A protein has these predicted regions:
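Helix-to-loop junction immediately C-terminal to a conserved catalytic motif
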Residues: 48
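Walker B catalytic motif
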Residues: 175-176
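Conserved ABC transporter NBD signature motif
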Residues: 56-63, 76
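Conserved ABC ATPase "signature" region
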Residues: 110-141, 193
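The feature captures the beta-strand-to-loop junction immediately N-terminal to the Walker
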Residues: 33-35
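Conserved ABC ATPase signature
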Residues: 146-150
Length: 251
């Protein structure tokens, strides 16, 4: 589904991505792990168009999308969440969700004059979708709460909900567990598993919480110094001597 081939990226002479080739299979939950500086975030930034690779390609369903801008990739169904949630703090939870679908008819001044019925129907559909998302993520009771007042874990749930508003092809989750208590992290994990099993969502996540990864992810890709060290089940990864060395050192 998503394929990265022979990818290179350097910053000031330091090679952050070194000849990476990998595939993210459709309807999988793939974890991307490795020590700080391994190149995980740089790889995400290339996939979602935030930065351009020096060479190599990124393909979605065998279509070369290398160099596409983030908004173009959004329209193709590649969505990303961040380690620090990017909510619109002065808008309510529900409004945060409703503003996600692109190219809404009501955004055009002319359409407000000439297509009021179309706008009303579209808004009803988006409202219905937002209500379904909030129900799914157990956020319905916070519909009218300003997003800036949410806890860290609730903001992560809201970000996940924003991706659900457009039925994505792949969701890139950047440390969804960072700063989240275990109860809310379990809720997030439950939602990810349901989206994967019931709606066949594809996820790729950068994550450090091994317990969380063990529950959700197969396969696990290990990165070190800008390269792929291995790709396997988490049980195999935890037993691998090279992985242990990368995380804990030779001694």
């Amino acid at each position: 589904m998503l394929r990265v081939k022979n990818l290179y990226k350097s910053f000031g002479g330091i090679r952050a991505i070194n000849n990476i080739t990998l595939e993210i299979e459709k309807s999988s939950i793939t974890a991307l792990i490795g020590p700080n500086g391994a190149g995980k975030t740089t790889l995400f930034n290339i996939i979602n168009g935030s930065i351009k690779p020096d060479s190599g390609t990124v393909e979605l369903n065998e279509i070369d999308i290398t160099g596409y801008e983030p908004h173009q990739l959004f329209n193709l169904g590649i969505l990303r969440t961040f380690q620090v949630a990017h909510e619109f703090s002065s808008l309510t939870v529900k409004d945060n969700l409703m503003m996600v679908p692109p190219n809404q008819t009501g955004e055009s001044i002319l359409q407000t004059w000439f297509s009021p019925k179309k706008i009303k129907l579209e808004e009803q559909n988006i409202t219905r979708k937002a209500d379904e998302v909030m129900e799914f993520l157990q956020l319905k009771h916070l519909a009218n709460e300003y997003a800036g007042n949410l806890s860290g874990g609730q903001k992560k749930l809201l970000e996940l909900g924003r991706t659900m508003m457009v039925d994505p092809k792949i969701v890139l989750l950047d440390e969804v567990g960072a700063g989240v208590n275990r109860t809310l992290l379990n809720t997030i994990g439950d939602a990810i598993l349901r989206l994967n099993k019931e709606f066949h969502y594809t996820f790729c996540m950068i994550e450090h919480d091994i317990e969380f990864i063990s529950r959700l992810c197969d396969p696990v890709i290990v990165m070190a110094e800008g390269s792929i060290l291995m790709k396997d089940k988490i049980s195999k990864v935890k037993e691998n001597d090279k992985v242990i060395e990368v995380y804990l050192g030779k001694n």
